Amino acid sequence: MSYFIISDGKEIKSFETAQDHKRVLEGDKGANTGGMGAYSPSRLLNQPLEEKILNKIIKPTITALEEMGSNYKGFLYAGLMIVKDEPYLIEYNVRMGDPECQTILPKLKTDLFEIINACCNENLQDINIEWNDKKSKCIVLCSKG
């Protein structure tokens, strides 16, 4: 599962989740890729799991960055594996994922510029990020090679 937040160094705002498909062939077969498709929201997420993700992974990471003198501003993308309702961090990226963001951004009702501007100016607490409740899919078409 892909879990996204944006932080202005003080405030954390969660974005929608997504689930990507890395294998080049149907049925989870073939070589790994950067992502052949995605859907949002992830069917794995529920309220108790989201609380675990925030409290065990995201918030401690932001706190550790602060303790190291880094006032992190921007997107943080946690690539997670969920085992028996427990989240395990596989990777972090400091960007939106692709193709995940192609499923997430169409669901965003709040102006993305306003969110990023608030992030840059340390005013995320003043932004209410709103989403539509639709589901979204993305399929990547690519050439062989």
Segments (PLM) and residue ranges:
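Active-site "cap" helix and flanking loop/linker of ATP-utilizing ligase/carboxylase catalytic domains
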Residues: 54-76, 93-145
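Internal nucleotide-binding/catalytic subdomain
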Residues: 1-102
